[in-house]
Amino acid sequence: MSEKYVVTWDVLQMHTRKLAARLLPAERWTGIIAVSRGGLVPAAILARELGIRHVDTVCISSYDHDNQRELRVLKCAEGDGEGFIVVDDLVDTGGTAQAIRDMYPKAHFVTIFAKPAGRPLVDDYVVDIPQNTWIEQPWDMGVSFVEPLSGR
């Protein structure tokens, strides 16, 4: 990846609330399925904003920090997804998204960020990201002191 896009906690919450507004009225949803781990934080925000208490997970391993590797399904939520919002932080190449579509064909699949290759696989997203950009999520970063350039 040649570029980095840094996401702060407040920006993530703002984008997720924007997505939640598009998912109203909340009564049409049975629950949320969070794609672990990237979809866990957005799922918590969506659950709060929509008043949804039924939250499950599908656990798929496809990244090792910044290296994409083979998909492994570690845990599935039951059913075909009918009445459920499936949420992940990002759709990238579409590998994970296609697996989600195959497992939950009747779900409404949303992400916060979408890259061109995976965009056709999601029902809704908030932010367009160039394909060659790595997203640094707030849960992968910490705040630290930076020495002034002048050394004072």
From Swiss-Prot:
One of its GO terms (biological process) is XMP salvage. GMP binds at residues 69, 92-96, 134-135. It is found in: Cell inner membrane. Its main location: membrane. Its cofactor is Mg(2+). Purine salvage pathway enzyme that catalyzes the transfer of the ribosyl-5-phosphate group from 5-phospho-alpha-D-ribose 1-diphosphate (PRPP) to the N9 position of the 6-oxopurines guanine and xanthine to form the corresponding ribonucleotides GMP (guanosine 5'-monophosphate) and XMP (xanthosine 5'-monophosphate), with the release of PPi. To a lesser extent, also acts on hypoxanthine. Homotetramer. This is Xanthine-guanine phosphoribosyltransferase. The gene is gpt.
